[in-house]
A protein has these predicted regions:
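Conserved mixed alpha/beta core segments that line enzyme active sites in large multi-domain catalysts
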Residues: 1-32, 81-296
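An N-terminal structural lobe/cap that precedes and organizes the functional/catalytic core
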Residues: 30-40
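Hydrophobic residues on conserved beta-strands that form the core of alpha/beta folds
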Residues: 40-41, 176
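A structural-propensity feature for long, helix-poor, extended segments
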Residues: 41-90, 159
């Protein structure tokens, strides 16, 4: 953890990860699924106190709170400096992590029960494979600053206007995690990724709403989060798959491409577009990698 704030006392993804990690430590899930390692990826949380310090030290708070051009605001954040102790800790982190890194937002207001903030703030991925450690550090610092800047971008402002909250209340922590996956040629991705929900609003057959529902897809979970074609099933009844009318319907509603981290351009740092480091491939590429058959 970077900063004085305890991640377990925070909000958003940071607190959720700390809770799940503690929960797994007190269970025997590994015994129930031999050969499968169930754990939370190694994570570093940059606390909201660092966010406050960054705004104050670079005199960004007043600029950030005023409605302004997103590009100008982003430039102001990118040219600002992170605290020296944060940079030192990030250097240590990069010495231990050589996989691609997900730089994720974890805001104070994310846990709002009636106003979900999913997709409002940025998550950036960096390939983390440049041979120069200084460039890898600079890319990581830029990704953190871009997450900070997204706190005050127009989409976030407009969404907050629909809630009882004000932008002055928001604070941003950042979660750094190695991307789970395996390198293949010039890309990096997991065998599958997805989202699990504890309540299924559309059960059928033997399914019960409280059984939950899982949506998974080959590669990174981006296609699932964006509502693209993915496989949905109940963890309690994994053999019960969606029943469609005919083979044509199955083909139309099946995944046709997958997303991976692009490893071919290590010199390319994070940009305004959070998906800049990602690349989409046809399924033929996964077949060549040997990753399609186990999940198809």
């Amino acid at each position: 953890h970077i900063g004085a704030e305890n991640p377990g006392h925070g909000r958003g993804k940071a607190r959720g990860l700390a809770f799940v990690d503690a929960l797994l430590a007190g269970t025997e899930l590994d015994d129930e699924f031999p050969g499968i390692d169930i754990h939370v990826p190694r994570s570093v949380v940059i606390g909201t106190d660092v966010f406050d310090e960054f705004l104050e030290a670079n005199r960004l708070r007043m600029l950030a709170l005023r409605p302004s051009n997103d590009e100008w605001l982003t430039w102001a954040f990118l040219t600002a400096k992170l605290p020296a102790y944060v940079i030192t800790d990030l250097q240590v982190f990069l010495e231990r992590v050589r996989d691609p890194i997900a730089v994720r937002s974890s805001s104070l207001l994310e846990d709002s029960q009636y106003h979900p903030f999913a997709g409002i703030y940025s998550t950036h991925m960096i390939p983390n494979n440049h041979p120069d450690a200084r460039i890898r550090l600079a890319q990581l610092c830029d990704a953190i600053k871009l997450v900070y800047a997204s706190t005050f971008h127009t989409p976030a402002r407009r969404y907050l206007e629909l809630t009882p909250h004000r932008i002055e209340e928001e604070k941003m922590a950042v979660v750094l995690q190695p991307v789970v996956g395996t390198p293949h040629d010039n890309c990096y991705y997991p065998n599958f990724g997805g989202v699990a929900r504890s309540y299924n609003y559309y059960p059928f057959g033997r399914m019960k709403p409280e059984d939950g529902v899982v949506s998974v897809a080959l590669g990174l979970g981006k296609i699932v989060v964006e509502g693209g074609p993915a496989l949905r099933f109940s963890p309690a009844h994994p053999q019960v798959l969606p029943q469609l009318a005919d083979g044509k319907s199955f083909l139309e509603q099946s995944q046709r491409e997958f997303f991976a981290v692009d490893l071919s351009r290590p010199e390319r740092g994070p940009g305004v577009n959070p998906d800049q480091a990602l690349v989409a491939f046809d399924l033929e590429v996964a077949e060549r990698h040997g990753t399609l058959a186990p999940v198809a």
